[in-house]
Design a protein with these regions (language model features):
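Basic, Lys/Arg- and aromatic-enriched nucleic-acid-binding interface segment
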Residues: 1-45, 55, 67, 90-91, ...
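Active-site/catalytic core of tyrosine-dependent DNA strand-transfer enzymes
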Residues: 1-10, 75-125, 134, 142-143, ...
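Conserved tyrosine-mediated DNA breakage-rejoining catalytic core shared by Y-recombinases
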Residues: 43-86, 158, 164
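Catalytic-site neighborhood detector that most strongly recognizes the C-terminal catalytic loop/helix
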Residues: 61-69, 81, 144, 154-189
Length: 203
């Protein structure tokens, strides 16, 4: 699996801000980076799964859509919520969050984000799934977060079945703090003068 090194992430983010493709694709890419979910989880996301007005916004992904067949909670950073607000202006906020450009009743193509990465000059160097690896590396190396909280946020299942049977903790309070820290870390990787203007990306 092709994945960027953490040192390559700042340049990628700057190139992403210059992306000239469809606006929903741009927003989808930013949302994937902020949440490091799997591509399939993003493509099939429905608005009914999101609780955005809560003091602790969260995305609840149903078990049937998860690789490990277990319901997954994604605490949403302020930045992720702002992305979704912009997405709602495009997709309508009623059914699919990231619909196909050609048919609002069908999900975004499974290769849409990958091809956008290629257009940015990262063919064979990066994939959408690779952001999960980058996030895992940075979060673990920061030594700010419990490894179990990181693994739970990545929706990985404990390989040790005995431990898995006893460790059902969601680590939600820590994961909320971690996801906000991650979003702020991502934003800090760009030069201070580079302010994300979501409106500049065409619909």
């Amino acid at each position: 699996m092709a994945a960027l090194n953490p040192e390559e992430l700042p340049e990628f983010l700057l190139r992403l801000d210059d992306y000239q493709g469809h606006r929903l694709t741009y927003l989808g890419m930013r949302f994937v980076i902020y949440t490091f979910v799997r591509t399939s989880e993003l493509r099939l996301a429905e608005w009914k799964e999101f609780e955005l007005k809560s003091s602790n916004p969260v995305w609840t992904i149903p078990a049937e859509r998860m690789k490990m067949r277990r319901e997954h909670l994604v605490p949403l950073s302020k930045q992720a919520v702002q992305i979704l607000q912009q997405v709602a202006e495009i997709s309508g906020g009623e059914h699919l969050v990231f619909p196909s450009q050609n048919n609002p009743n069908k999900p975004m193509s499974e290769n849409t984000l990958l091809f956008a990465i290629y257009r940015m000059g990262y063919h064979s160097r990066a994939t959408t799934h690779g952001f999960r690896s980058v996030a895992s590396t940075i979060l673990n190396e920061s030594e700010k977060w419990h490894p179990d909280a990181i693994e739970r946020q990545l929706a990985h299942v404990e390989s040790n079945k005995v431990r898995a049977a006893y460790d059902r903790a969601e680590h939600l309070p820590e994961r909320r703090r971690m996801m906000q820290w991650w979003a702020e870390h991502i934003d800090s990787l760009k030069q201070p003068a580079d302010v994300i203007d979501l409106e500049q990306h065409r619909a």
